[in-house]
Amino acid sequence: MNQQQKYILNLQRKSRERKREQAFVIEGRKMFEEAPADRIKMIVASESFCKSKEGAALLKGKKFDVVSDSIFETLSDTKTPQGILAVVKQQPYSFEELLGKEKASFLLILDHLQDPGNLGTIMRAAEAAGVTGILMSSDCVDIYNPKTIRSTMGALYRVPFVVSEDFAGDIERLKKAGVSTYAAHLGATISYEGADYKKPCAFMIGNEANGL
């Protein structure tokens, strides 16, 4: 295994490597097709994928490296690899970008989520619901975890998000910016039907086991 392949494996397996390199790995045709071209650092394809009509069409005009199917299986994080992966630069977002420019802020605030699949699914659903951004506590699972990336189904490229190092402080910043925050509580006296969601607002979601 060469240095490039070791680099890919480290990005697949280690959160600290993804953070240090400011990069992550995507797999499969959909994630590859939707990836912003200017953020793709490296493309790797399996021999069988390159020989397929689908692969030849997808890779036409692109610079990529070819590896054997067995090597690709080693590099892949999935049980049934699709034959194409890429290393992509992470996209940093500012706190201001969460607030939305063209419409009222509609945010999610995620506290201590631990399941990679849950985080990805939430991001995918958030995009469908029109969320303008996501604020996450620093103890949430890594958003660039391979399972999270797959679960986003491409929403990762389009929904701004910030991992907060001052979670309580940033929530206060949202409130000062005119964003109302909402969370479900068994002892609450206000029905969810009574709130005005047309104004800037944020919904809080807590840990899978312990809530907020």
Spans of model-derived segments:
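Short, hinge-like loop/turn segments at secondary-structure boundaries
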Residues: 59, 84, 151-155, 198-202
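Glycine/small-residue-rich loop that forms an oxyanion/phosphate-binding "nest" at active or ligand-binding sites
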Residues: 59-89
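Short, aromatic/basic amphipathic alpha-helical patches
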Residues: 51-61
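Generic beta-sheet signal
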Residues: 46, 67-68, 87, 137, ...
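RNA substrate-binding interface of SAM-dependent RNA methyltransferases
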Residues: 95, 99-188
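Boundary-proximal intrinsically disordered activation/regulatory segments immediately upstream
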Residues: 1-53, 140-141
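Active-site/ligand-binding-proximal alpha/beta "capping" segment
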Residues: 182-212
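Short, hydrophobic beta-strand segments that form beta-sheet elements in well-ordered domains
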Residues: 24-26, 41-47, 66, 180-185, ...
